Amino acid sequence: MELTKSEMEIMDVLWESGQPLSRSDLLERSEEKTWKDSSVHILLNGLLQKGAIREAGLVKRSKTYGRVFCPTMTREEYFATTIFSHRHKP
C-alpha cells in the first residue's frame, strides 16, 4: 500500500494521537495545514479504500454524530510493509 504525502500526514496525526479521531479532530490537530473539511473527507475515504484506516465508531458533536477513525497498523508495521513490498517488486 502506497500513501500520498497528504495521506501520510493524516496517518501521522492518527498515529501520534493514540486514539480514534473524527474529521473535526484531525482538522484541529493539523492547524498548520491549510486543509479544507472536504479535502480531509476525500483523504479519509482514500485511506479507508486502501485499508490504512478503519471506522472505530461514532462520536456526538453538538447535535450530530460523526465517525471516528483509527489506523489499521502501527507506523512501524506500515514502514516494514512498504520496505518489503519495494524490495520484492518484479
Model-derived features: positions:
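Short alpha-helical segments that sit at the start of domains
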Residues: 1-13, 17, 74-75, 89
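Short, cationic-aromatic polyanion-contact patches
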Residues: 3-4, 58-80
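Basic amphipathic alpha-helical segments that dock to polyanions
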Residues: 10, 41-50
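Short acidic, hydrophobic short linear motifs in intrinsically disordered regions
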Residues: 20-30
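Glycine-centered, phosphate/nucleic-acid-interacting loop/turn motifs that mediate DNA/RNA or nucleotide
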Residues: 51-57
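Amphipathic alpha-helical dimerization/coiled-coil segments
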Residues: 78-90
